[in-house]
């Protein structure tokens, strides 16, 4: 009986000692992302490369619900006009431009050989400033050299958000892509690897 009472007192003291370390005035290490109001619309794309792009995806930071995708873009035509994909629903993006937002773009390309065909990704892709009240949807523009630019078309006269103007090679919002080793392993040729 005395042993049970002693054990009960020890357990109670341990529990109380654990609570003594909590202080309400200390800052928490948990960071809650700020809530961003999102718009939703079609995602479209243009392909200025000589390769067929089967599909692409756009993803925002975890927990933001920003993302979408599209696909089936023919290669650039002989006259220099880009291959395009029609609108694919639904891309979610911030209603107001977020200067610190960085996105990841992945795309599956057929370069007519086994070594360089497959998934590519560009990380930390920025979207140029846009007017969310005049949105013409999100565009992914694929450029030679495994590069990509994202934009929210808004009729901006400076050309940074105009789909009528091919992004220049010195455009600061163009991101470099690299082969995506993880997705090339998980989804060879765009199909999920079977678990045996």
Regions found by a protein language model. Give the residues of each.
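Bacterial N-terminal signal peptides that target proteins for export
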Residues: 1-9
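Short, surface-exposed binding/anchoring microloops in extracellular/periplasmic proteins
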Residues: 30-61
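Bacterial signal peptide processing site
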Residues: 20-23
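Tryptophan-paired
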Residues: 58-111
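Beta-strand-rich cores of mature extracytoplasmic or soluble domains
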Residues: 98-196
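Short, intrinsically disordered, charge-biased short linear motifs at domain edges
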Residues: 5, 30-33, 73-78
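C-terminal motif of bacterial Sec signal peptides marking the signal peptidase cleavage site
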Residues: 15-18
């Amino acid at each position: 009986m005395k042993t049970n009472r002693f054990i009960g007192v020890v357990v109670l003291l341990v529990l109380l000692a654990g609570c003594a370390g909590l202080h309400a005035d200390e800052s928490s290490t948990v960071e809650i992302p700020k809530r961003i109001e999102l718009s939703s619309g079609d995602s479209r794309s243009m392909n200025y490369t000589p390769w067929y792009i089967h599909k692409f995806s756009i993803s925002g930071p975890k927990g933001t619900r920003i993302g979408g995708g599209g696909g089936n873009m023919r290669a650039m035509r002989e006259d220099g006009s880009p291959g395009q994909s029609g609108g694919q629903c639904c891309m979610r993006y911030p209603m107001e431009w977020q200067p610190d937002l960085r996105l990841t773009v992945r795309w599956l390309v057929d370069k007519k050989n086994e070594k360089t065909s497959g998934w590519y990704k560009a990380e930390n892709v920025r979207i140029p400033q846009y007017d969310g009240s005049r949105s013409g949807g999100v565009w992914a523009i694929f450029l030679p050299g495994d590069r990509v630019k994202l934009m929210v078309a808004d009729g901006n006269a400076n050309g940074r958000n105009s789909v009528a103007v091919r992004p220049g090679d010195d455009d600061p919002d163009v991101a470099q892509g690299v082969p995506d080793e993880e997705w090339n392993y998980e989804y060879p040729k765009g199909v999920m690897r079977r678990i045996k």
